[in-house]
A protein has these predicted regions:
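N-terminal low-complexity, intrinsically disordered segments
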Residues: 1-36
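Gly/Ser/Thr-rich loops at beta-strand to alpha-helix junctions
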Residues: 10, 49-54, 84-85, 108-111
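Short coil/turn connectors at secondary-structure junctions
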Residues: 37-42, 73-76, 97-100, 115-117, ...
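Short glycine-rich or small-residue beta-strand-to-loop segments that form or flank ligand, phosphate
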Residues: 41-54, 102-104
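Glycine-rich phosphate/diphosphate-binding loop of Rossmann-like nucleotide-binding domains
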Residues: 52-73
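Active-site rim loops that border cofactor/substrate pockets in soluble metabolic enzymes
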Residues: 68-96
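Glycine-rich phosphate-binding loop
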Residues: 90-117
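C-terminal functional extensions of proteins
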Residues: 107-181
Length: 181
């Protein structure tokens, strides 16, 4: 696991300057590039986002349910980002030479879900990538989308991205999802 920070120095900057949460601080990209090797199929990134509690509670169980389903994939070292926004995964994937970024992100707490986590998937991310190029799996938590079901959706989308070379609005999850599938 590699720990990095965004360019947002603190929570105030993170909230007032969203652009800083999308960029890596200092030489983090250079430090991550040391782990690029010959490239990776996917890079998993954990960003505290708007609810650190969400990723603290749900990132590990989702990864434990997902990673066994990705046997044979070249998976980059896990990166944990302090004060990170979704788009920071673009810079991280580029530094690690990863084809796909998966950002596990603490979603904005709502009245009924203070601990909801989202997974944002992007094929061939670049600094110019827009949100339209991302797929999102939201409300990952026991009271929402269960880890096993989220892992099925996540790995299905990853395989589809790799096969079709697209993500975001061009790629729909059009399969029927059954409990525990």
């Amino acid at each position: 696991m590699r720990a990095v920070a965004s360019a947002a120095a603190d929570r105030t900057h993170y909230l007032m300057r969203p652009d800083l949460g999308r960029r890596l601080a200092g030489d983090a990209d250079t430090r991550l590039a040391a782990y690029a090797g010959s490239g990776h199929d996917v890079a998993f990134v954990i960003a505290d986002g708007l609810s650190a509690r969400a990723v603290e509670m749900h990132a590990r169980p989702l990864l434990e349910a997902s990673l066994p389903r990705l046997a044979g994939w070249r998976i980059a070292p896990l990166v944990v980002v302090r004060q990170g926004r979704v788009a920071i995964g673009d810079e991280i994937a580029r530094a690690l030479c990863a084809d796909i970024a998966v950002v596990l992100f603490g979603e904005r707490p709502g009245l009924s879900a203070p601990d909801s986590m989202g997974a944002y998937l992007t094929f061939k991310p670049t600094p110019q990538t827009t949100d339209a190029a991302r797929n999102c799996i939201s409300n990952i938590r026991p009271e929402g989308l269960a880890y096993a079901d989220a892992a099925v959706t996540l790995t299905h989308l990853l395989r589809a991205m790799r096969a079709r070379q697209i993500s975001g609005v061009q790629l729909k999850d059009d399969r029927l999802l059954l409990d525990g599938e």
